[in-house]
Amino acid sequence: SAGQTTPAYAEDGVTPVGTYSIDPATGEVTFTPTEKSYTGKVTPANVQAEDTNGTKVSTTYTPSIIPAQPEAEPAKTVDVQGATQTGKPEFQGGTAMVNGEEKTVEMDDTVPAKLVDPKTGDKVDSLTVEGEGTYTVAPDGTVTFKPEPKFTGVAKGVEVVRQDKNGTPAKATYTPEVKPVTPTGTDAVTEDVQGSTQTGK
């Protein structure tokens, strides 16, 4: 009947992944996903129709959910020893062909970007790598790297994670490089007559 919904399950027949509803006037069945991360087949909805003569006919409706994996491009920056660097990996929503039409699942800008702690796997806002420096991520995915004063070379970098509107994650690395700075000096030479005090810099 109108307004009623029936649970829709994953292929295992146990895990709820959405609901079915039917328009009694047209017989059109609508599948509404509730588990946005699920992809694959959904258990079919059995639909029974009856004509004016009372003849019943049964059919099934089987939706299939095609995955759309978001993509990410890593970022690299280079600066001199001691300088704070910022870099931003680029994230794009995933696309999939559905019935000959390209569909995109956009990135979710309401969920802040995080760094992945390589030791624990936890998602964090700030991370210190011993002997290297401290990384901090802004909600939009911009990473700030504050190197330790003596650190030079290519850093191990960090993994940045964002998700699309279905909650599907995408990861990319940010790798800063620190160029060494060697202080330079110019020899000072002065000349004066014998017995005079001289200064040089």
Predicted feature residues:
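Generic structural motif
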Residues: 2, 6-7, 20-22, 70-72, ...
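Conserved positions within tandem-repeat grammars
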Residues: 18-20, 83, 113, 125-127, ...
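Acidic, turn/loop-rich segments in luminal/extracellular domains of secretory-pathway
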Residues: 11-59, 126-172
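Extracellular interdomain linkers/hinges and stalk-like, low-complexity segments
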Residues: 1, 44-45, 52-107, 157, ...
